[in-house]
Amino acid sequence: MALENLLHPTNIKIDEYAKNATKFSFEALERGVGYTLGFALKQTMLYSIAGACVTSIKINDGKVTSLEDVIPCDETVADIILNVKSLPVTLAEGVETGTITFELSGSEEEIFSEEAKLSEGLAITEEVFICSYNGGKKLKIEAKVEKGVGFRPAQDNFKDGEFLLDATFSPVVFCDFEIKDARVGRRTDLDKLELNIKTNGNVNCEEALRLAATKIQNQLRNILDIEEINKGIFVEDPTKDINPILLKHVEELNLTARSSNCLKAVNIRLIGELVQKTENELLKAPNFGKKSLTEIKDKLSELGLSLGTLIENWPQDL
């Protein structure tokens, strides 16, 4: 079959069946194309769209240190953490972090997200119930908001007066797809792709789908121009003069899970990226302590490497 004769979806349906929830259907597609597109779009929406979320919570300036502590609310500490964590938040362009603060005193009342004090560039996009305040004693709740991509696990449950939270940054909270049979004329060997998307309201489902499709398109752009490739254009390997050990992934150092997660949190993937960091730079990374530093130095030493190494002509786009 000629490439120009391959089917493209001409029947596209959009069913917004609930708030922030939409089902898209595309037909007809060549057999197998439905699964390929569905899987790529799902993974991209869940793990590659940037967003913001609450990453840590401090109660009464860090004096509340346990989920069992008593606070002047009908809810438990765990309830409040879950309610604050569920806040759908956005950060303005150029703003990487923000703070949400609730300062409660006086008579009893029900507290909602609209009563929060927000740092500049931070917004809460939907009203969320926080707690039923019993009055009397003061209660202060502070939440840190960060931008990010994908999922970042908390390295500790509690540190420096803060409850640390697993961070799910994507505004897409659910995405799945189903492939059904489709028919065009006499052809019955075709796919129908049904894509089910739910978001937290920070972006609508159509925008999430559009962002994912654009990201996939950008990833493929460098291999789309077959004509240029056929001209035999030679691109010099930017890594040809670099020690092959430096191009290996840090996983090959066999670090402990804690040290590995610390490096992932600051996007250090290759040994070459790691050795160019100084001790002070690593110690500034979230949850990175001297024990992890010692372990990394020992592992690098076994390979004849050390931190603070300058690598000339290190490619920035590996």
Swiss-Prot record:
Annotated InterPro entries: DNA-dir_RNA_pol_insert, DNA-dir_RNA_pol_RpoA/D/Rpb3, DNA-dir_RpoA, RBP11-like, RNAP_asu_C, RNApol_insert_sf
Region entry Alpha N-terminal domain (alpha-NTD), spans: 1-227
GO cellular component, one term: cytoplasm
GO molecular function ontology, one term from the record: DNA-directed RNA polymerase activity
Pfam families on file: RNA_pol_A_bac, RNA_pol_A_CTD, RNA_pol_L
Record bears the keyword Transferase: yes
Region Alpha C-terminal domain (alpha-CTD), annotated ranges: 242-318
EC numbers on record: 2.7.7.6
Catalytic activity: RNA(n) + a ribonucleoside 5'-triphosphate = RNA(n+1) + diphosphate
GO biological process terms on file: DNA-templated transcription
Keywords: DNA-directed RNA polymerase, Nucleotidyltransferase, Transcription, Transferase
Family listed: Belongs to the RNA polymerase alpha chain family.
Function: DNA-dependent RNA polymerase catalyzes the transcription of DNA into RNA using the four ribonucleoside triphosphates as substrates.
Quaternary assembly: Homodimer. The RNAP catalytic core consists of 2 alpha, 1 beta, 1 beta' and 1 omega subunit. When a sigma factor is associated with the core the holoenzyme is formed, which can initiate transcription.
NCBIfam families assigned: PRK05182.1-2
Domain statement: The N-terminal domain is essential for RNAP assembly and basal transcription, whereas the C-terminal domain is involved in interaction with transcriptional regulators and with upstream promoter elements.
Name of the molecule in the record: DNA-directed RNA polymerase subunit alpha 2
